[in-house]
Amino acid sequence: MFYNKLEQKRKINFFINKIYHLIFSEKFSKKINFNFDKKSRFDLINYVIEKNKYNNYLEIGCHNNEVFDKIKIKKIGVDPISGGNFRGTSDKFFEQNNSNFDCIFIDGLHEYDQVRKDIINSLKFLNKNGIIILHDCLPPSITHQRVPRTRYSWNGDVWKAVVEARTWKDIDTYTVLSDQGLGIIKNK
């Protein structure tokens, strides 16, 4: 008898939660119009560049040019330590920048405050039909997102900036389940 009441209560709670989420949760019916079946960030970036016939590219956080070297259009890479062709932080780059970009890839300092600033600054220099791609948006475990960094393989809390950006009125955001999560931001 106790089990039956407990099971009945569980079913009622499940039903109430289902109704609540149908009424109050986000309705998401946007389409990104990408037919993307590859696994890596550089595959997605090159696919987007080719599909949209983009001419220029900005990469924030180049770390040994792992992605940067695979991009075959006019490009600027920003990194304070290694890779790219602008030695300095993204903040320093944006202070002196006067160019707009078709495609911007953010894979720099994986901390919410900096990623948020990188998104805001990137939006200022994004061409009308351009796209921003962010890496490391879906950490596989709590240790992968812990700030400060405690492990070599690390996503940081990039995901928080992407979640916040979803509330901004003038952009659309998407997350691709690929390569530790790829966030995509476009102007509406």
Question: What label would you give each PLM region?
Answer:
Residues 1-105, 109-188:
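A short alpha-helical cap/connector motif
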